[in-house]
């Protein structure tokens, strides 16, 4: 995108697949086009590739460290402005899964909701009663897990638990 934004006729040949592990010095692409456009876009393209490769690599390392197919490593909704889709794609390439794409695809019960509702279970029950299908409940104590699940939470987020 960086190169074609400056030279729509730029020829780009990708030499590796997305998510493919590569070593230092590996050529990732071959470009043919306007030299000024290439040099202008180079740093932005390299920085973006490095950033996304770092995400995919770190996620892959964490997934391997978990060494448990029953566990799923989820990302955060908190991404760099303008890079959400790319960062979430990098997470998937590394073997992780996306937690939420935005605020629209799941309700998240947090400590403020629990405080207003009076309990974790009641906060989840209210979301269920409102017709919410995907309910992620944040818990910070072990005794909150069962009530959250019994009330209908579809996922738990363990917050600051040692």
Regions found by a protein language model. Give the residues of each.
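Acidic/glycine-rich phosphate/pyrophosphate-binding loops and surrounding catalytic core
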Residues: 1-151, 155
């Amino acid at each position: 995108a960086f190169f074609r934004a400056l030279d729509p006729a730029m020829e780009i040949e990708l030499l590796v697949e997305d998510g493919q592990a590569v070593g230092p010095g590996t050529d990732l692409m071959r470009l043919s086009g306007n030299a000024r456009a290439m040099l202008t876009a180079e740093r932005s393209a390299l920085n973006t590739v490095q950033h996304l490769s770092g995400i995919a690599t770190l996620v892959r390392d964490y997934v391997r460290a978990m060494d448990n197919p029953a566990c799923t490593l989820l990302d955060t909704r908190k991404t760099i402005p303008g890079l959400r889709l790319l960062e979430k794609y990098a997470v998937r390439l590394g073997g992780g899964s996306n937690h939420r794409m935005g605020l629209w695809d799941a309700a998240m019960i947090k400590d403020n909701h629990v405080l207003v509702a009076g309990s974790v279970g009641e906060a989840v029950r209210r979301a269920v009663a409102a017709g919410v299908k995907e309910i992620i409940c944040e818990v910070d104590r072990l005794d909150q897990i069962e009530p959250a699940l019994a009330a209908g939470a579809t996922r738990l987020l363990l917050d600051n638990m040692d």
